Amino acid sequence: MATYTTSDFKPGLKFMQDGEPCVIVENEFVKPGKGQAFTRTRIRKLISGKVLDVNFKSGTSVEAADVMDLNLTYSYKDDAFWYFMHPETFEQYSADAKAIGDAEKWLLDQADCIVTLWNGAPISVTPPNFVELEIIDTDPGLKGDTAGTGGKPATLSTGAVVKVPLFVQIGEVIKVDTRSGEYVSRVK
C-alpha cells in the first residue's frame, strides 16, 4: 500500500486515519523558533463526516486510502437507497442515506455525480456544482421589488429551500450553486 509523508500533504489528499478514510481540507507547514517542525492539518473523515484538527511531526508517514472517485449518473431512488450507474460499463451502485447526506436535495434524474467508493461501496456523493431547478413555492413579488439586498425563501422542485431575489416568481427555473446552496441566476 502506498504511503504519504507530510511533505506530500495538500488539500484533497485522501489517507487512512484510525482505520477510516480521511481527506485533507487544509494544511499548513509550521516551523516554530524552538522545537521540531510540524504540519498542522484539518481533516474530514469520509464515513462519519467529522472534521478534526490534527498535527503531524515533520516526516511522519500515513497510509494512502484505497478510495476511488467515479463519475456516475444518478438513476433513481427507492425506499432506502439511491442508485447510480456508470455511463460506460452500466454497472449499478447503491448509496444509502448516510452516503448521500445533503446531496439529496440537489439530485436530479440523469445528473452526473462524483461518487467516492471505499471497499467497493459508496461512502459519499458529490452532486454537480450547478443545478437548474423550478421554483414551486415562494412569496409573490410586489410592484417596486428590485434586485437589491432583499431576498425571500423559495422552495424548489427537489424540496430544497433557497434565498432568491424578490423579482423571482413561482414556475421560473433558476440556477443554484450546490456547494453553497445559493441562487446564481434565472435560466432563460
From Swiss-Prot:
Pathway: Protein biosynthesis; polypeptide chain elongation
Keyword ATP-binding: no
Superkingdom field: Bacteria
Post-translational modification note: May be beta-lysylated on the epsilon-amino group of Lys-34 by the combined action of EpmA and EpmB, and then hydroxylated on the C5 position of the same residue by EpmC (if this protein is present). Lysylation is critical for the stimulatory effect of EF-P on peptide-bond formation. The lysylation moiety may extend toward the peptidyltransferase center and stabilize the terminal 3-CCA end of the tRNA. Hydroxylation of the C5 position on Lys-34 may allow additional potential stabilizing hydrogen-bond interactions with the P-tRNA.
A molecular function (GO) term: translation elongation factor activity
CDD domains: S1_EF-P_repeat_1 (cd04470), S1_EF-P_repeat_2 (cd05794)
Family membership noted in the UniProt record: Belongs to the elongation factor P family.
Name of the protein in its database record: Elongation factor P
Source organism of the structure: Pasteurella multocida (strain Pm70)
